[in-house]
């Protein structure tokens, strides 16, 4: 049986640092008009995205929680399964402790002021702002991934530690809200180079055909 595995479908999660460092944020969207449609194209300038800077080596973690409930009959058999909840969250650790845009996400829009080299942050009970956020990922072998949340809000921030042996960082968990029934978009541009395919599949067949043609050419040369 032919080996139909395809390395074009194998992706890594490295950041595309050429795309604003790999992560950008902007105002939350209210409709899908300006949603991205191509992992290789820049976001619409109308989204007003700016760089969010360095993130930790843990990258970005997506969690999809789909809670269900089994409805059973008198005999204890499952009759139907209902869905009671669905949520999408993102977790990322920001490493730029003085990045104003990041601080506004985790402390509040009106609680951060930047004047020259001075950044002032106030912690209070203000509701945190909603933002759109994009992650640009280099999938390897020329492939690209764009993960885009049109409306996300930070719901939890980890402890901030000030020590000599580490940088000041903010671990943020964000809830993704639906915009036109879309909470999160993942766009994938696969590698175009057929050389990354596994040996023995369709490419293997092509190689065998090429080998047969080469053999025929050699035989013809010997006959001449």
Predicted regions and their residues:
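Polar/acidic, low-complexity leader/linker segments enriched in S/T/G and N/D
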Residues: 1-51, 203, 213, 218-220
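N-terminal short leaders/motifs
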Residues: 21-48, 79-91, 116-130
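A glycine-rich, hydrophobic loop/mini-helix early in the fold
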Residues: 42-87
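Short acidic, glycine/tyrosine-flanked loop/strand segments centered on an H-E-D-like triad
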Residues: 61-63, 69, 94-96, 145-158
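Short helix-loop boundary/capping segments
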Residues: 99-150
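Beta-strand-rich interaction surfaces with strong enrichment in secreted/lumenal proteins
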Residues: 77-80, 135-137, 160-162
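Mixed-charge, glycine-accented linear interaction segment located at domain edges/termini
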Residues: 143-224
């Amino acid at each position: 049986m032919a080996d139909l595995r395809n390395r074009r479908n194998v992706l890594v999660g490295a950041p595309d640092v050429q795309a604003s460092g790999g992560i950008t944020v902007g105002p939350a969207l209210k409709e899908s008009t300006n949603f991205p449609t191509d992992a290789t194209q820049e976001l619409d300038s109308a989204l007003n995205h700016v760089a969010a800077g360095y993130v930790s080596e843990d990258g970005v973690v997506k969690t999809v929680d789909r809670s269900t409930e089994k409805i059973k009959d008198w005999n204890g058999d499952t009759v139907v399964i209902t869905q009671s909840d669905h949520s999408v969250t993102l977790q990322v650790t920001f490493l730029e402790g003085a990045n104003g845009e990041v601080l506004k996400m985790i402390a509040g829009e009106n609680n951060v002021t930047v004047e020259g080299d001075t950044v002032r942050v106030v912690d209070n009970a203000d509701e945190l702002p909603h933002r759109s956020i994009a992650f640009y990922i280099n999938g390897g072998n020329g492939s690209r991934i764009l993960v885009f949340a049109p409306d996300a809000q930070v719901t939890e921030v980890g402890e901030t530690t000030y020590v000599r042996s580490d940088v000041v960082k903010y671990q943020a968990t964000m809830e993704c809200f639906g915009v036109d029934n879309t909470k999160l978009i993942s766009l994938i541009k696969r590698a175009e180079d057929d050389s990354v395919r596994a040996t023995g599949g369709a490419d293997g067949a092509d190689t065998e055909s090429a080998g047969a043609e080469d053999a025929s050419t050699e035989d013809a040369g010997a006959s001449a």
